[in-house]
Amino acid sequence: MKLSKYGRRQWLAATVILVAGLLVSGVLMYFVFPAGCFFAAASLLVWGAFVTFFRDPHRVIGQDKTELVAPADGIVKDMELIPNASCEEAVLRELFDGYDILRIGITQSLFDVHIDRMPCPVTVKVKESREKTEEKEDSSFLLLGGTGEIEDTQFPVALKQISGGKLCRIVCKAEVGDRLKKGARYGMIRYGSRMELYLPAKSPVSIIANTGERVHAGKTVLAVFSREKQV
């Protein structure tokens, strides 16, 4: 099982703790064999659960250039049409340049793969983050925005990684100026929370995913490009 480089420090630390736990188990087995066996089994179980969270399975990215794939594993929780003038994020209002915005929200559980991927080829233009503070009890987030391109048609696209819990941490290795391929890994949300994908509401891109649908990053098709639709 391949483990993500985004969690290398965490799963290496877990492995060191496992080795220490097994050494303790060996000592316990010498004195109280059942207790030592139980401690060893518990150590292996905890280690297995921990490193499984950082798994990075191989994904075959679809070669159909007209398809946009899911940016994260999870459940499509909601879809919302946001009038540009009503959008709370100034960076999104500017990125979408007057166009209304369609937001697709994907929620993640601890059991999902947490590697985030690009839904289509994207040139990154903006990277903005906000940390949770005592004054603001809402979630921390990192927003990545840029220009998506499908069959020589360009359109604004944005991805927002959201961490709700105290243990959740956002990792984003993409930087302004990067040109990322469809399905390219660019980060993760450690211990999970929510991913939001933003697309122009009126565009050549048609949404085919449904709320309640389980999706897989880089694999499940969320939307398709059609030249019959006009921006």
Residue ranges and their predicted role:
Residues 1-231:
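Contiguous, well-folded functional domains in the mature portion of proteins
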